[in-house]
Amino acid sequence: MARMIQCAKLGKEAEGLDFPPLPGELGKRIYESVSKEAWQGWLKQQTMLINENRLNMADPRARQYLMKQTEKYFFGDGADQASGFVPPTEG
């Protein structure tokens, strides 16, 4: 049976992650309160940020930036948007 959590990002009960996705306190916090669906949304956002900003993941500053953005995405006022990103419109 799937582990259900109250997702902090989606504001609804949803299936939780199978394991902490990151080391440390932030990973534990995400594991306890972020759903698989919300995590997949972050992976897409993270990919856009890496590509648009040409982040080198070997650079500790780039990794630190992404950690801050991860926390803002789930628990703050939202992560930065990729500069050229235009959300899709319905219709």
Swiss-Prot record:
The keyword Iron is annotated on this UniProt entry: yes
One GO CC annotation: cytosol
InterPro entries linked: Fe_traffick_prot_YggX (IPR007457), Fe_traffick_prot_YggX_sf (IPR036766)
Keywords attached to this entry: Iron
Molecular function GO labels: iron ion binding
Any one GO BP annotation for this protein: cellular response to oxidative stress
Domain of life (superkingdom): Bacteria
Disulfide bridge positions per record: none
Keyword Iron: yes
UniProt cross-references to Pfam families, sorted A to Z: Iron_traffic (PF04362)
Function: Could be a mediator in iron transactions between iron acquisition and iron-requiring processes, such as synthesis and/or repair of Fe-S clusters in biosynthetic enzymes.
Family (UniProt): Belongs to the Fe(2+)-trafficking protein family.
Protein name stated in the entry: Probable Fe(2+)-trafficking protein
